[in-house]
Amino acid sequence: MVRITALMSGSILLFALQALAMPVETTSVEPAAEKRGLKLAFKRGEEVEPAEEKRGLKLAFKRGEEVEPAEEKRGLKLAFKRGEEVEPAEEKRGLKLAFKRGEEVEPAEEKRGLKLAFKRGEEVEPAEEKRGLKLAFKRGEEVEPAEEKRGLKLAF
């Protein structure tokens, strides 16, 4: 008896062996570590062990399984999609999630804080650094032409 795993690449061989009247046993494909393997197993309705990598978390979420909120970006995103309360983190992803949830975020001195404040329509003091000049320019404020490169570019 010949044992062949039926895959797209091996289907021609399968038909050739069947034509020769050889007994052929087909087996299902084990869930592979690569993305396409997990997707195929999921489409076939097989149970796939939730992996630690992004694709595993996504599949578990699609199956409706409970996924532990991870500290990494993908964990925060999944928790947000499930409607769970996520503690606002100091890093960019935390500020973004808090902003999407409509929470009040303290305007930070860093670029992301200024961007969020600008999106919320808050008044932001024009800073001397590049991001401050850019925001002031976007708001249509008059910006004094500076001697430095960024000021000249924005004024132009």
Curated annotation (Swiss-Prot):
<feature type="propeptide">
    <location>
        <begin position="100"/>
        <end position="112"/>
    </location>
</feature>
<feature type="signal peptide">
    <location>
        <begin position="1"/>
        <end position="21"/>
    </location>
</feature>
<keyword id="KW-0732">Signal</keyword>
<feature type="propeptide">
    <location>
        <begin position="43"/>
        <end position="55"/>
    </location>
</feature>
<feature type="propeptide">
    <location>
        <begin position="81"/>
        <end position="93"/>
    </location>
</feature>
<keyword id="KW-0843">Virulence</keyword>
<comment type="function">
    <text>Ribosomally synthesized cyclic peptide victorin precursor, part of the gene cluster that mediates the biosynthesis of the secondary metabolite victorin, the molecular basis for Victoria blight of oats. The vicA1 translated product contains a 7-fold repeated peptide embedding the hexapeptide Gly-Leu-Lys-Leu-Ala-Phe, that is converted into the cyclic victorin.</text>
</comment>
<feature type="propeptide">
    <location>
        <begin position="119"/>
        <end position="131"/>
    </location>
</feature>
<protein>
    <recommendedName>
        <fullName>Ribosomally synthesized cyclic peptide victorin precursosr vicA1</fullName>
    </recommendedName>
</protein>
<keyword id="KW-0677">Repeat</keyword>
<feature type="propeptide">
    <location>
        <begin position="138"/>
        <end position="150"/>
    </location>
</feature>
<comment type="pathway">
    <text>Mycotoxin biosynthesis.</text>
</comment>
<feature type="propeptide">
    <location>
        <begin position="22"/>
        <end position="36"/>
    </location>
</feature>
<feature type="propeptide">
    <location>
        <begin position="62"/>
        <end position="74"/>
    </location>
</feature>
